[in-house]
């Protein structure tokens, strides 16, 4: 009999790649996935839709969440269902807390009730570290969090409640904070994916308007390909200690760039020359985070995991994805 994996948020960016990774590498597992009745968009997962067993669930509803956990009774849970775009969190803070915190709480409470022995991956965000200075880089497991947007606060709350359920009830929470990851299927509201999407549209339309709309360009991040990230997530559920916090990011100096540098590299990959860009006010955040860079982490020391895919390949893969979509 196959072991059972439950993926929440499988219709999204990371969740869909996680499903691909499991199907390609672990045929002894059956994937179960939650979807919000008729509301979930399935375009990112349509290529493997028939290989997944679907469960209707709204994770913000505790009764619905408990029914799902009881029905599936999984061996592993990858909990990706979340509101993840930072900018709208200032306008919709209740929504972010409802999905990211309450949704996680409902899953954990259901696991407690059925005495689940499953490991659950709780993916946090580098955004939780918030407003740090250049001298505070690289971020380590000992760096204090300083969240400065509602999204980051919701992820801190998600992480802390998972620790509470581990400590109080023995729920096997694998806690990770993941730094910037990009690649195909990333929604076109996020920096690099937004630039690539706009370039692909300009290429297709051959428009005279060659302006790419951008937000903050000076922010510096270390970037990891989503395929390296899902590999790290699987390894985390196999090797990481439950209850302990791990950071996942690409510490290689060749992975550290500003968004300005990423934009210029994408421009150089375009078939259209003389592309320009301009600041678009709605893309500018009320409070900005200039630096989010991790060094070599305890996760890498424990597992030996290292990202394999270069930053240039991240950009190429993202641009080619949008060329195939627009």
Label every PLM stretch briefly.
Residues 195-201, 239-284:
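Mid/C-terminal beta-alpha module of Rossmann-like enzyme folds, strongest
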Residues 229, 233, 248, 259-262, ...:
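Non-catalytic, hydrophobic alpha-helical segments
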Residues 226, 245, 282-306, 310, ...:
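Conserved C-terminal active-site "lid" loop/helix of NAD(P)H-dependent oxidoreductases
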Residues 43, 132-138, 160-237, 259-269:
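NAD(P)-dependent short-chain dehydrogenase/reductase
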Residues 40, 60, 91, 99-102, ...:
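Residue-level signal for the nucleotide or nucleotide-sugar donor/cofactor binding architecture
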Residues 177-181, 210-216, 221, 233, ...:
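A recurrent short beta-strand within the Rossmann-like NAD(P)-dependent oxidoreductase core
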Residues 1-181:
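N-terminal Rossmann-like NAD(P)+-binding domain of SDR-like oxidoreductases, especially those catalyzing
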